[in-house]
């Protein structure tokens, strides 16, 4: 980000925040190569080294200064040569540079807003597992939940128009339209849903920026409605790209209001609605009446229809009671369960039995989808019976065990937050037995003969890491107690969830 600041200052005074001239700067493509999501494009697809790739960029910039070389007809073939290279690659190089240039002012704006508010970043909250402790703290006291999937834009122009208030120069809009419409014309037979998937794979940096800004526009309604509902003068929240910044700003606002409006502090510490999002899936939850939740639902529907031109039926957004329905989020089925307890109280000669009911959040592993995924990867059949992995049978014993261990370790690492570990143990059992069958297949033996020859020590590595983690949590407990430990463990080093 410091590199962004240095380079942008060189052009800001002359170009007045215009982004279009930045695509003629070589350092933009250098930043795209170093920082890009698709940094291997210029190397792997062409077989050139870094110097040759930068030479291609210099030649492209030289040709762009010449007349009519930036505009390519949509009717041309994909294999029209430009400097001897594929036309798709040419557009991809330019789109990478354009994506970097359009990211710079928004990133700098975000950093400046954080410095003004003096917000301390907490890197632990970047973990997606930090959402579940939030669920445990808040959701037992809530009544209703609604899971909402943010719709994809149905037209390319919507992606362009979301930037109209933030980018000043019209040339950048025309260039963005050129990338989107030209690519869409090349793939005119592809449906819009498949086109979005294809575009996200071919131009990930540009797609992620456009989609994140699109989601940011969608989430702006929550700040607007919060201001209208509270009847208090709140400072503007600006553009928030990450959940941690949104959460931190809300906390900072609570501290400010604590000095000026002490009587209304509870309104912000215990807000009337909670909103959590990961990628395109969001959760709305509240302890108010269904009427209040329905108002929020229609706010969202009218926002989609009037601002994004996306038609959505109200019946597709369901409002459910947390005590009766579970919701799926980040690989877990979660619901609020009533946990009854009986306490015997004695006062002098009289004794009383007090029944107490507490709400507790349950997080359950979706065992059936996981078994389907394992069956698709040929670790088991559709019924969950382990089978061998013939593709790996040609590898060494160490590589086979290491591959199974890596998969088992990742699943155990992510799903250790489950309330019921039986499903997790079943998945690990499938992987262990599949590993044994693969080794037995390689050595042309049966499972029983193979285990008799090597002993059960061959599978002890599957348990080693989990015991080490539990020993850190319960350092004074015996190994037997550690094995019987069934508490939930949330890790703060998981940054993404591969769906």
UniProtKB/Swiss-Prot annotation:
InterPro entries: Domain_X, Maturase_MatK, Maturase_MatK_N. Its main location: plastid. One of its GO terms (cellular component) is chloroplast. GO terms for molecular function: RNA binding. It comes from the Eukaryota. It is found in: Plastid, Chloroplast. One of its GO terms (biological process) is mRNA processing. Keywords: Chloroplast, mRNA processing, Plastid, RNA-binding, tRNA processing. Pfam families: Intron_maturas2, MatK_N. The keyword Transcription regulation does not apply. Usually encoded in the trnK tRNA gene intron. Probably assists in splicing its own and other chloroplast group II introns. Belongs to the intron maturase 2 family. MatK subfamily. This is Maturase K. It comes from Gymnocladus chinensis.
């Amino acid at each position: 980000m410091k590199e962004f600041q240095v380079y942008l200052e060189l052009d800001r005074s002359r170009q007045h925040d215009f982004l279009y001239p930045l695509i003629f700067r070589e350092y933009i493509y250098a930043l795209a190569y170093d920082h890009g999501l698709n940094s291997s494009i210029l190397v792997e697809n062409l077989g050139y080294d870094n110097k040759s790739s930068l030479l291609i960029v210099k030649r492209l910039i030289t040709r762009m200064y010449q007349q009519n070389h930036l505009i390519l007809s949509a009717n041309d073939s994909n294999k029209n040569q430009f400097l001897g290279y594929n036309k798709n690659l040419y557009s991809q190089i330019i789109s990478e540079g354009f994506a970097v240039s359009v990211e710079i002012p928004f990133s700098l704006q975000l950093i400046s807003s954080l410095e003004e508010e003096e917000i301390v970043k907490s890197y632990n909250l970047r973990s997606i597992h930090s959402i579940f402790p939030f669920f445990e703290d808040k959701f037992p006291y809530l009544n209703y939940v609604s899971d909402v999937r943010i719709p994809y834009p149905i037209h390319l122009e919507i992606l362009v128009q979301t930037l109209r208030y933030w980018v000043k120069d019209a040339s950048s809009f025309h260039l963005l339209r050129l990338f989107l419409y030209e690519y869409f014309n090349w793939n005119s037979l592809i449906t819009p849903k498949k086109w979005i998937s294809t575009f996200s794979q071919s131009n990930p940096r540009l797609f992620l920026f456009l989609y994140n800004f699109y989601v940011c526009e969608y989430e702006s309604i929550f700040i607007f409605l919060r201001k209208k509902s509270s009847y208090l003068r709140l400072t503007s929240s600006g553009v928030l790209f990450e959940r941690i910044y949104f959460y931190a700003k809300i906390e900072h606002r609570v501290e400010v209001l604590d000095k000026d409006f002490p009587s209304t502090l509870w309104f912000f510490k215990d807000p009337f609605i909670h909103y959590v999002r990961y990628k395109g899936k969001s959760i709305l939850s509240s302890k108010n009446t269904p009427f209040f939740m329905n108002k929020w639902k229609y706010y969202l529907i009218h926002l989609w229809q009037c601002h994004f031109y996306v038609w959505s039926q109200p019946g597709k957004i369901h409002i459910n009671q947390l005590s009766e329905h579970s919701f799926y989020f980040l690989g877990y089925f979660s619901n609020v369960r009533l946990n009854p307890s009986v306490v015997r109280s004695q006062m002098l000669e009289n004794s009383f039995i007090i029944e107490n009911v507490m709400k507790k959040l349950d997080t359950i592993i979706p065992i059936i989808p996981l078994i389907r995924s394992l069956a698709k990867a040929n670790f088991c059949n559709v019924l969950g019976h382990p089978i061998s992995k013939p593709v790996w049978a040609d590898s060494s014993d160490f590589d086979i065990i290491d591959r199974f261990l890596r998969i088992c370790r990742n699943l155990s690492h992510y799903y250790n937050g489950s309330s019921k570990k039986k499903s997790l143990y079943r998945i690990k059992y499938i992987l262990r037995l599949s590993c044994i069958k693969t080794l037995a297949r390689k050595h042309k033996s049966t499972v029983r003969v193979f285990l008799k020859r090597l002993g059960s020590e061959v599978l002890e590595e599957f348990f080693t890491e989990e015991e080490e983690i539990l020993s850190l949590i319960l350092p004074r407990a015996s190994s037997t107690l550690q094995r019987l430990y069934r508490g939930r463990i949330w890790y703060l080093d998981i940054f993404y969830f591969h769906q």
